[in-house]
Curated annotation (Swiss-Prot):
Forms a complex with cognate antitoxin TacT. Keywords: Plasmid, Toxin-antitoxin system. Probable antitoxin component of a type II toxin-antitoxin (TA) system. Should neutralize cognate toxin TacT (y4aS). Belongs to the TacA antitoxin family. This is Probable antitoxin TacA. It comes from Sinorhizobium fredii (strain NBRC 101917 / NGR234).
Length: 107
């Protein structure tokens, strides 16, 4: 039988050089709270540090996933080929640009 693996939790927010001055309040279900408290205790962190770390790491991963654009090799090549060798503007594109120029006032 395999031994359970204990995950080491590092407080990733400790390296952020600014004071803790902002509050976050939220409600949750009793079972969720108990589970978080148990995991926090097993990790050697208090409830707040554990919850903040988990939320912060998830936020960073979510932002990174949304900021990254992954392309297959063929798509990558087509994308950069189009940038390097753009097609000549069509009549419809010229008309659209003209309407835009007449409608939008730049500051």
């Amino acid at each position: 039988m395999k031994e359970p693996v204990m995950r080491a939790i590092k407080d990733v927010t400790i390296d952020i050089d600014e004071p803790n001055t902002v509050r976050m309040n939220f409600r949750t279900k009793e079972r969720v709270k108990r589970t978080i408290q148990r995991a926090a205790a097993l990790s050697g962190l208090d409830d707040s540090a554990f919850t903040i770390n988990a939320a912060y790491q998830s936020a960073i991963a979510t932002i990174a996933a949304h900021e990254a654009t992954l392309l297959q090799t063929t798509d990558y090549q087509a994308f950069f080929d189009a940038l390097d060798n753009p097609p000549k503007p069509t009549d419809r594109l010229r008309d659209a640009f003209k309407r835009y120029s007449e409608t939008v006032v730049s500051k």
